[in-house]
Curated annotation (Swiss-Prot):
Residues 167-185 have a biased composition (Basic and acidic residues). GO terms for molecular function: SH3 domain binding. The lineage of its organism: Eukaryota, Metazoa, Chordata, Craniata, Vertebrata. This is SH3 domain-binding glutamic acid-rich protein. The gene is SH3BGR. It comes from Homo sapiens. A motif (SH3-binding) lies at residues 124-130. Pfam families: SH3BGR.
Length: 239
């Protein structure tokens, strides 16, 4: 009888708690009853906006976004050309970026002007687009971008880690190999120079030796002539 009463009253209690009713035979086993109740719990992200599917805390993924401030309606051909070059380069290299127009959005214009460092602003204090940021970190203007691109340090300029197969890493490796080859070539090139120098020094020493020998021979000849001249008067006196 107690089992029957439990079976009759348990469905009512479960319905009141917004849980599915269980069979009378399952109510006798607490493990089965709990197993039947668990499937009604809503574990979706909507029910737990700050938690994961299993109720764990969600940690936001930090993703750096490159911001390029442009003026789409600029009347300057030079500015439009610079903007197109920056945007085209980022697209060609599959670098994610966000294009922000300052011509039609006062907030974008104000934010750009306030976040460009003072030493990077022109004399009138109004920086011209394109201006490049990594989130809130200032990267530079077009001139800085162009220099970084020419030196192949664009990822460092943007504050991004270069991909493994990027041209920057390849250029660094090639640069190291080129420097090593250049040093080796310089060492090899120095050998003939050293040999030539030694040969020149040897020739110079030989010439000096020959000159000294010639001078010595001339000196001896002069002494012999003087001796001969000194002997001739004596012979005349004897005769």
């Amino acid at each position: 009888m107690p089992l029957l009463l439990l079976g009759e009253t348990e469905p009512l209690k479960l319905e009141r708690d917004c849980r599915s009713p269980v069979d009378p035979w399952a109510a006798a086993s607490p493990d089965l009853a709990l197993a039947c109740l668990c499937h009604c719990q809503d574990l979706s992200s909507g029910a737990f906006p700050d938690r994961g599917v299993l109720g764990g805390v969600l940690f936001p993924t930090v993703e750096m976004v490159i911001k390029v401030f442009v003026a789409t309606s600029s009347g300057s051909i030079a500015i439009r050309k610079k903007q197109q070059e920056v945007v085209g380069f980022l697209e060609a290299n599959k670098i994610d970026f966000k294009e922000l127009d300052i011509a039609g959005d006062e907030d974008n214009r104000r934010w750009m002007r306030e976040n460009v460092p003072g030493e990077k602003k022109p004399q009138n204090g109004i920086p011209l687009p394109p201006q490049i940021f990594n989130e809130e970190q200032y990267c530079g203007d077009f001139d800085s971008f162009f220099s970084a691109k020419e030196e192949n340090i664009i990822y460092s300029f943007l504050g991004l880690a270069p991909p493994p197969d990027s041209k920057g890493s390849e250029k660094a490796e090639e640069g190291g190999e080129t420097e090593a080859q250049k040093e080796g070539s310089e060492d090899v090139g120095n050998l003939p120079e050293a040999q030539e120098k030694n040969e020149e020094e040897g020739e110079t020493a030989t010439e000096e030796t020959e000159e000294i020998a010639m001078e010595g021979a001339e000196g001896e000849a002069e002494e012999e002539e003087e001796t001969a001249e000194g002997e001739e008067p004596g012979e005349d006196e004897d005769s």
